[in-house]
């Protein structure tokens, strides 16, 4: 951290942050964010891995720390569970035309989330992922409806 701070003071680094991809590291991320000032954190958060919403996302929101969400599809676990199952009949009301959009829009609509970074090597998936950002994001009531539907599958 001292080296990073020196690089920032020198103007060679503008923003600093920390990252992890597992829920069992959230407590350590919280500890570090409580002790050091960072501009952003990158963390896993999804319908399959919602643990960050309990403490880490509120902490970031309170401290003005930008949140980048990695692993939004939980390494494909969300798609595996949704395979063969229809989107809810009201999916278009929350701007979703695919399961990928459903998952991304649920994440992006959390008030602490700044951006979601899904990884893909398939152009069609990239197009679908980008479409998730076209409509207004779900509100708190819609997010809860999305979560409840997901839990019912």
Residue positions per predicted region:
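Beta/alpha (TIM)-barrel catalytic core signal, keyed to glycine-rich beta->alpha loops juxtaposed to Asp/Glu
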Residues: 1-153
